[in-house]
C-alpha cells in the first residue's frame, strides 16, 4: 500500500504490466483495499461508480464533509461505543496500539503519537538538540507550521530555493546556505512529493547536520524516514490520513531520541514514572486515546484512499496532456515517490487569477492557491527585518504560477471531467488559441 506498490498496482490494473502476480499484504492499512479488490477490477466503474454523462454543475475544492466517508463514520461510531464508557479519553490502550500499528507500517522502531504535526516538529527538533540561534535549512513554500516550530524554539529558519519541477527543496542549493551556525536540514515533502532525501542525507553527513523531515503531507511514501534522523507526521483531517481532530506523530529508529521525544511530549517526565521530571520542561503534546481509537479505524482506508489519489492524478495528467504539449500549462510528473496530497499545475502568472475566476463563474469549479504567501514574504516584523532582501528565484516563480485542482478520495470522475472541460475552455480562451 505504499507509493511504489500503488504505482505498480495501477499499471497492473490498467493492463500495462503483464505476467506478475500481486499480493496485497495483510495489514490494517490495506483492510478496505483488500475487500475492494476481491470484488472489483475495473477502477472507473467499480471504484468510482463512473457515469460518464452525469451532469455536474459545481465542483468544490476540498469540502470538509467529504473528507470522511459514511463507511468510516459507521466504523468510528462503533468504536466510540467501546471507548466512551471507559472514560479513558486521554491515555489508554488505543494510543499504545496506534503507535505500534504505525510503527509497523512505517518500518520504524519507535513512534510517538503527538497532538499535532507542529508539536511533532518542535519535539523532534528539541530531541535532536536545537538551541537558541541554531540555523535550520528549509524551503519557504511550506505551511507556516514548519517555520513556526523552529521560531518558537529560538531557531533561525534559513530558506533555500526549490526544484521548480517538484516544489521540494533543491539539494544543490543547500550546501551554499550552510554556515558555522547551521545544525539542521528540514525538508518538506510538499503536496505529497518525496524530497530528494538520499542526496540531502549525504550533505548532512558531510557537514555533520541532523535531518528532520516534515512528512505531514507524505504518509504512504515508500522509504519514508529512511534518510532522516526523525520523521514527523500530521493527522489533521485534511491530510491523506487524518483523525477527527488534530494529531501527529514522530518516527525514529534511535532509542535515545525516542525516549527524549516521549519526555518532551509529556511535561518532561521520566518514561513510565509518575510526575518525575528528568528534563527541564516538556509539553502537553500526547495524542489523545480517543483520537487514537478513531485513527485505528480510519487507518483501514489509508491504502485505498492513497490509491484513489494516484488514479485521479494519473487521469488528470493524461487528460490535460494536450494543454501541456502546447505549452499552455505545466503538469506534475506521475512518479512512484508521490502520494498526491494536492495536485498542482502551473499556468502563466498573468493569467492565474482570471483562470480561477472563470473556472468558478462559468463552470462551478473551485481551485485554490493552497499557501498564498511564501514564508520570506510575510509582513511580520521578523520577516521584514531578516528576510526582506532574500530572493528565491525558483520558489517565487513557481509560487506565482501554481494552481491547485480538486483531488481527494471522494472526488468523482464526473467532477474531474468537469474540471478538465473547464480548464480546456478557459485556458484556451485566455491565450486566444
Predicted region positions:
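Conserved PLP-binding active-site segment in aminotransferase class I/II-type PLP enzymes
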Residues: 5-123, 127, 131, 400, ...
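PLP-dependent aminotransferase class I/II
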Residues: 26, 36, 40-49, 54, ...
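PLP-dependent aminotransferase-like
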Residues: 43, 126-215
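Structural detector of well-ordered beta-strand residues that form the stable sheet scaffold
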Residues: 112, 137, 158, 211-212, ...
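Short, acidic/turn-prone active-site loops that include or flank metal/cofactor-
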Residues: 162-166, 217, 237-238, 372-374
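Structural preference for beta-strand elements that scaffold enzyme active sites
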Residues: 210-212, 230, 402-404
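Conserved active-site segment immediately N-terminal to the catalytic lysine
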Residues: 213-244, 272-277
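Short beta-strand-to-turn element immediately C-terminal to the catalytic PLP-Schiff-base lysine
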Residues: 233-234, 248-253, 296
Amino acid at each position: 500500500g505504499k507509493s511504489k506498490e500503488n504505482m505498480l498496482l495501477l499499471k497492473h490494473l490498467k493492463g500495462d504490466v503483464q505476467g506478475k502476480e500481486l499480493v496485497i499484504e495483510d495489514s490494517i492499512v490495506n483492510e478496505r483495499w483488500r475487500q475492494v479488490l476481491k470484488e472489483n477490477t475495473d477502477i472507473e466503474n467499480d471504484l468510482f461508480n463512473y457515469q460518464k454523462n452525469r451532469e455536474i454543475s459545481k465542483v468544490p475544492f476540498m469540502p470538509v464533509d467529504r473528507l470522511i466517508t459514511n463507511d468510516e463514520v459507521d466504523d468510528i461510531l462503533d468504536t466510540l461505543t467501546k471507548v466512551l464508557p471507559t472514560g479513558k479519553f486521554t491515555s489508554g490502550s488505543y494510543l499504545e496500539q496506534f503507535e505500534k500499528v504505525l510503527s509497523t507500517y512505517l518500518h520504524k522502531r519507535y513512534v510517538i503519537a503527538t497532538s499535532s504535526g507542529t508539536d511533532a516538529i518542535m519535539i523532534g527538533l528539541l530531541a535532536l538538540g536545537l538551541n537558541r540561534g541554531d540555523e535550520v535549512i528549509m524551503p519557504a513554500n511550506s505551511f507556516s507550521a514548519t517555520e513556526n516550530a523552529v521560531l518558537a524554539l529560538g531557531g533561525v529558519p534559513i530558506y533555500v530555493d526549490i526544484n521548480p519541477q517538484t516544489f521540494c527543496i533543491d539539494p544543490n542549493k543547500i550546501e551554499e546556505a550552510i554556515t558555522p551556525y547551521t545544525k539542521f536540514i528540514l525538508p518538506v515533502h510538499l503536496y505529497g512529493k518525496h524530497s530528494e532525501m538520499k542526496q540531502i542525507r549525504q550533505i548532512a553527513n558531510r557537514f555533520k547536520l541532523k535531518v528532520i523531515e516534515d512528512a505531514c503531507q507524505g504518509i504512504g511514501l515508500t522509504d519514508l524516514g529512511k534518510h532522516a534522523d526523525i520523521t514527523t507526521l500530521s493527522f489533521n483531517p485534511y491530510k491523506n490520513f487524518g483523525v477527527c481532530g488534530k494529531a501527529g506523530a514522530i518516527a525514529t529508529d534511535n532509542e535515545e531520541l525516542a525516549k527524549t521525544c516521549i519526555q518532551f511530549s509529556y511535561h518532561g517526565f521520566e518514561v513510565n514514572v509518575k510526575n518525575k521530571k528528568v528534563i527541564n520542561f516538556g509539553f502537553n503534546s500526547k495524542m489523545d486515546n480517543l483520537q487514537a481509537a478513531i485513527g485505528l479505524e480510519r487507518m483501514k482506508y489509508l491504502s485505498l484512499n492513497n490509491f484513489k489519489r494516484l488514479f485521479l492524478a494519473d487521469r488528470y495528467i493524461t487528460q490535460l496532456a494536450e494543454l501541456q504539449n502546447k505549452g499552455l500549462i505545466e503538469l506534475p510528473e506521475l512518479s512512484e515517490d508521490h502520494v498526491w496530497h494536492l495536485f498542482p499545475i502551473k499556468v502563466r502568472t498573468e493569467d492565474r487569477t482570471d483562470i480561477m475566476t472563470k473556472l468558478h463563474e462559468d463552470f462551478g469549479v473551485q481551485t485554490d492557491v493552497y499557501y498564498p504567501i511564501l514564508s520570506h514574504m510575510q509582513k511580520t516584523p521578523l520577516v521584514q527585518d531578516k528576510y526582506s532582501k532574500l530572493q528565491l528565484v525558483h520558489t517565487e516563480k513557481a509560487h506565482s504560477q501554481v494552481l491547485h485542482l480538486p483531488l481527494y478520495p471522494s472526488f468523482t470522475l464526473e467532477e474531474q471531467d468537469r474540471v478538465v472541460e473547464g480548464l480546456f475552455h478557459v485556458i484556451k480562451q485566455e491565450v486566444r488559441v
